[in-house]
């Protein structure tokens, strides 16, 4: 009887741990005719979603930290990290994102026509004194040793020069673009 109880306890612990993280691999068409691989990790214990886009010089990592309320994105070809306060009206809840990814992976036909444009000004928005406790450890691990810029939601796409925007895969599907806010 003790063995059965011990077995059930171990089984329930493993089941809880297996539900803590869920990984989705998605392939979307790239601009050059090939496919772009995206790996999305949903961590229900940390309340985060980490999106890795594997696309050569356009590769990026984005963390949605629902516990602290921030989104950080690092385009790997640039030595910079971009951070924005999460707008819970514009960004789906973690469980909805998880459901969307499941449907995207299984149906491979979901898309959004709404876009959230994020702009930053590299001359004005550099964050020099960073309170990592505010942003949380997942974002700290992503952005600690590179310049960090504060982004803001642009209410109209005309506020940003769309030629300098990064929008790939899941970020594009969720309607998020990162754009430089400099107009010459």
Curated annotation (Swiss-Prot):
Q: Which UniProt keywords apply?
A: Disulfide bond, Secreted, Signal
Name a single GO biological process: gene expression
> So which domain of life are we looking at?
Eukaryota
The subcellular location is:
Secreted
Q: Does the keyword Hydrolase apply?
A: no
Q: What is its main location?
A: secreted
Disulfide connectivity for this sequence is 81-143
Q: What PANTHER family does this protein map onto?
A: GASTROKINE 1
Protein name, please?
A: Gastrokine-2
């Amino acid at each position: 009887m003790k063995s059965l109880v011990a077995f059930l306890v171990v089984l329930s612990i493993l089941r809880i741990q297996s539900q803590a993280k869920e990984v989705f691999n998605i392939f979307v068409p790239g601009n050059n005719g090939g496919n772009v691989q995206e790996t999305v990790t949903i961590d229900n214990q940390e309340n985060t979603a980490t999106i890795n886009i594997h696309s050569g010089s356009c590769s990026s990592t984005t963390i949605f930290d629902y516990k602290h309320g921030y989104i950080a994105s690092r385009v790997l070809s640039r030595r910079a990290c971009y951070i924005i306060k999460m707008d819970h009206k514009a960004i789906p809840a973690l469980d909805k994102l998880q459901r969307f990814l499941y449907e995207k992976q299984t149906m491979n036909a979901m898309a959004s026509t709404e876009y959230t444009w994020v702009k930053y000004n590299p001359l004005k928005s550099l964050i020099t004194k960073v309170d990592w406790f505010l942003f949380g450890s997942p974002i700290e691990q992503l952005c600690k040793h590179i310049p960090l810029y504060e982004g803001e939601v642009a209410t109209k796409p005309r506020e940003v020069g769309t030629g300098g925007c990064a929008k790939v895969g899941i970020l594009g599907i969720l309607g998020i673009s990162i754009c430089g806010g400099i107009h010459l």
